[in-house]
């Protein structure tokens, strides 16, 4: 397993990566990619850290919102995702605030602005993701960025892999974790991959479900475009030209 920490960011021996799955974690980001037949994992502090290792046309799936509204209205892709995850996992799709709201640096300010714009506040869970939402939002406009980046919601992806049926068990439970790992069979021996990550990284930096989510994003990234579903099919574009769409296995 390739290891990258916040203090060692030499990726000279890695790549070019043609497909990657990324999930946020306490230490920054977990990146899953394939090196030959082996699935490797990296933990990086910033999204830009992985750029040099990505092929110019790499397929990158990330569990973080891409495309933000200006008026704080609900994103269509989130509404579709909630419907697809009924009745068990719809709550896993949180409302994504307007770009202006995500730029707030303290919760009272963000909550006040959100209420002023739409009459609805924001959850603290959503607020805690703002730094990562801002980072991704800015990174996607970088001229140096490699790869084609898509938003991927792990629970939507797992539902698709499960015959379009949302998983009733939470990923935080042993049963839910086991079910999700079984659905990742396309990637090979994910049990060993996950265990190597847990043996390498501290729980305060990376959790098992962070790794599992990165892996299902990788599985989606490795699918050819005709074997992917895009929600919605006629995705709207935000003010910065970013498509508001969620990708999943077809």
Indicate where each model-derived feature is located:
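RNase H-like (RuvC/DEDD) metal-dependent nuclease/polynucleotide-processing core
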Residues: 2-19, 24-250
């Amino acid at each position: 397993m390739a290891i990258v920490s916040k203090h060692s960011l030499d990726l000279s021996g890695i790549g070019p990566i043609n497909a990657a799955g990324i999930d946020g974690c306490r230490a920054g980001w977990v990146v899953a990619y394939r090196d030959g037949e082996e699935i490797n994992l990296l933990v990086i502090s910033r999204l830009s850290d992985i750029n040099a290792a990505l092929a110019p046309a790499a397929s990158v799936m990330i569990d973080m919102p891409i495309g933000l509204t200006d008026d704080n209205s609900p994103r269509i892709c989130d509404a579709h995702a909630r419907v697809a995850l009924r009745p068990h996992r719809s709550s896993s799709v949180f409302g994504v605030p307007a770009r202006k709201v995500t730029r707030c640096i303290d919760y009272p300010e963000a909550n006040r602005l959100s209420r002023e714009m739409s009459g609805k506040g924001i959850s603290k869970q959503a607020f805690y993701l703002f730094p990562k939402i801002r980072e991704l939002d800015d990174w996607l406009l970088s001229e140096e960025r490699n790869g084609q980046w898509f938003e991927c919601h792990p629970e939507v992806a797992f539902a698709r892999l499960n015959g379009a049926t949302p998983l009733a068990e939470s990923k935080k439970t042993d049963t839910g974790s086991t079910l999700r790992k079984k659905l990742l069979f396309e990637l090979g021996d994910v049990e060993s991959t996950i265990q190597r990550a847990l043996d390498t990284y501290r729980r305060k930096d990376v959790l098992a479900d962070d790794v599992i989510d990165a892996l299902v994003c990788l599985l989606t990234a490795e699918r050819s475009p005709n074997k992917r579903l895009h929600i919605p099919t006629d995705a709207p574009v935000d003010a910065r030209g970013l498509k508001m769409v969620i990708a999943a296995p077809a």
